């Protein structure tokens, strides 16, 4: 007797097709290649198109327009509202952006149908856990780790429990309107994280901290973009904080893939602290390096 195929709905946000022209095709190909037993449908939400737009891109792939007011978060809200009660016809909902494979995406190669099926047994959301060395606070909530918003899977019930995915709107008391000191003195963001955002988005690359691939100078002209991008980052963090507040654990994709492949079908998998989960990446890296060294020692001629 065959098990019913897992039903997954992807809500893929894009802003036009100039930067990632084949994003939805690449994502669908990944599902077909790595998860052929999954019944996959996709709703592409383009926040460069008017809200009333609607068309079909392909069989099982629908396109709608959305507001770009809060980037992917307001677009996801639009997609959820468009889907309506049909959202609960799926086993998992997949939040993604067109940049899902743009940065450090090796973990995506590990996801398969077994990982998705095991997720159904958890009270958790699956993605790539990012973290900072030092804890910080936003809106009085301590944070140190979060799920990268470009690729997250969870159950429809978990998603619906969040309501709107826009946690930090334009009226949030954060920004001063002054490019020389863009944050209000009473902004509900720790000073260290304010400095991180400034350096990440507008830094010159000096020092140990890395900077954003599209960094820019902060001027009166670029201030609105800075505020929008900073709010998007804060919305990403708050999405994780709200999931945690609802009792939904963070599940790292690399960790889960390793556990599923190592466990027997009868064994249960407990979700450990995020620090334990991300340490598995270091083990994977060490294993790959060891394999490379063994191959080189076997195939490369020795120096005399």
Indicate where each model-derived feature is located.
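ER/Golgi luminal nucleotide-sugar-dependent glycosyltransferases, focusing on the catalytic module
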Residues: 1-304
């Amino acid at each position: 007797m065959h098990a019913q195929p897992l039903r997954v709905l992807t809500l893929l946000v894009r802003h036009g097709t100039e930067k990632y022209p084949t994003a939805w095709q690449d994502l669908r190909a990944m599902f077909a290649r790595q998860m052929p037993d999954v019944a996959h449908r996709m709703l592409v939400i383009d926040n460069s198109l008017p809200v009333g737009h609607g068309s079909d891109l392909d069989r099982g792939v629908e396109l709608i327009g959305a507001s770009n007011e809060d980037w992917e978060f307001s677009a996801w809200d639009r997609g959820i509202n468009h889907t309506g009660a049909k959202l609960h016809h799926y086993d998992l909902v997949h939040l993604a952006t067109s940049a899902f494979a743009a940065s450090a995406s090796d973990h995506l190669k590990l996801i398969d149908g077994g990982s998705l099926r095991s997720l159904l047994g958890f009270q958790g959301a699956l993605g790539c856990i990012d973290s900072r060395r030092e804890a910080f606070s936003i809106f009085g909530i301590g944070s140190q780790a979060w799920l990268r918003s470009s690729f997250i899977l969870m159950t429809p019930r978990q998603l619906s429990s969040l309501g709107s995915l826009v946690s930090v709107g334009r009226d949030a008391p954060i920004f001063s309107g002054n490019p020389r000191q863009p944050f209000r003195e009473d902004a509900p963001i720790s000073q260290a994280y304010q400095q991180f955002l400034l350096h990440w988005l507008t830094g010159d690359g000096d020092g140990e901290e890395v900077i954003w691939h599209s960094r820019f100078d902060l001027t009166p002209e670029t201030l609105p973009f800075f505020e929008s991008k900073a709010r998007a980052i804060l919305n990403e963090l708050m999405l994780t904080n709200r999931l945690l507040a609802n009792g939904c654990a963070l599940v790292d994709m690399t960790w889960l893939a390793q556990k599923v492949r190592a466990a027997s079908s009868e064994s249960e998998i407990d979700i450990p602290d995020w620090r334990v989960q991300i340490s598995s990446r270091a083990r994977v890296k060490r294993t790959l390096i060891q394999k490379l060294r063994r191959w080189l020692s076997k195939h490369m001629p020795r120096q005399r």
